[in-house]
C-alpha cells in the first residue's frame, strides 16, 4: 500500500536580517530570519567571478540579486542590514536590496575594530 507523504510547508517570513561581508577579495551575503536561521546566501566567487573581478561593486550587486531571488519563496518584505568589512561592495549591495523590493529598516556597521591588536598589513605602494 502506498504511503501518504505530507508536503513540507514553506515558512512565511515577513522580516529578516541581511549580513553583508565585504572583504578586499570577495563579497558574501547571507539572509536569515530574525532567529538567525539561514534562508539563502550567495558569494561573488560562487557566482563565477574570479580573481580581481570578485571584489567589484558589480559583483556585489549580482550577489545581492541572487541572494534575494533565492529567498523569494519565503515572502520576505523587511530586512535589517548588517555590514562587515572594508570592501568596495558595501554600498552597491545595500542599494540593490532596495531595488529588489525589500524594505531596508536599518543599516548597522558591525566591522570589528581592534583595540591595538595584531599588526596591520603593510600599505601597498604601486
Swiss-Prot record:
MF terms (GO), sorted A to Z: rRNA binding; structural constituent of ribosome
Cited Pfam families: Ribosomal_S11
Cited NCBIfam families: PRK05309.1 (NF003698), uS11_bact (TIGR03632)
UniProt gene name: rpsK
PROSITE patterns xrefs: RIBOSOMAL_S11 (PS00054)
Species name: Treponema denticola (strain ATCC 35405 / DSM 14222 / CIP 103919 / JCM 8153 / KCTC 15104)
Quaternary structure (record): Part of the 30S ribosomal subunit. Interacts with proteins S7 and S18. Binds to IF-3.
Family stated for the protein in its record: Belongs to the universal ribosomal protein uS11 family.
UniProt keyword list: Ribonucleoprotein, Ribosomal protein, RNA-binding, rRNA-binding
Biological process according to GO: translation
GO cellular component: ribonucleoprotein complex; ribosome
Entry function: Located on the platform of the 30S subunit, it bridges several disparate RNA helices of the 16S rRNA. Forms part of the Shine-Dalgarno cleft in the 70S ribosome.
Record protein name field: Small ribosomal subunit protein uS11
Annotated InterPro entries: Ribosomal_uS11, Ribosomal_uS11_bac-type, Ribosomal_uS11_CS, Ribosomal_uS11_sf
Amino acid at each position: 500500500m502506498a504511503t501518504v507523504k505530507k508536503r513540507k510547508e514553506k515558512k512565511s517570513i515577513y522580516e529578516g536580517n541581511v549580513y553583508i561581508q565585504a572583504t578586499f577579495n570577495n563579497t558574501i551575503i547571507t539572509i536569515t530570519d530574525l532567529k538567525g536561521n539561514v534562508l539563502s546566501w550567495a558569494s561573488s566567487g560562487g557566482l563565477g567571478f574570479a580573481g580581481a573581478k570578485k571584489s567589484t561593486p558589480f559583483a556585489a550587486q549580482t550577489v545581492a540579486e541572487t541572494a534575494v531571488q533565492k529567498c523569494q519563496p519565503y515572502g520576505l518584505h523587511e530586512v535589517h542590514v548588517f555590514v562587515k568589512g572594508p570592501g568596495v561592495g558595501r554600498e552597491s549591495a545595500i542599494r540593490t536590496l532596495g531595488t529588489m523590493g525589500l524594505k531596508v529598516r536599518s543599516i548597522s556597521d558591525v566591522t570589528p575594530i581592534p583595540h591595538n591588536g595584531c599588526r596591520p598589513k603593510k600599505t601597498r605602494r604601486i
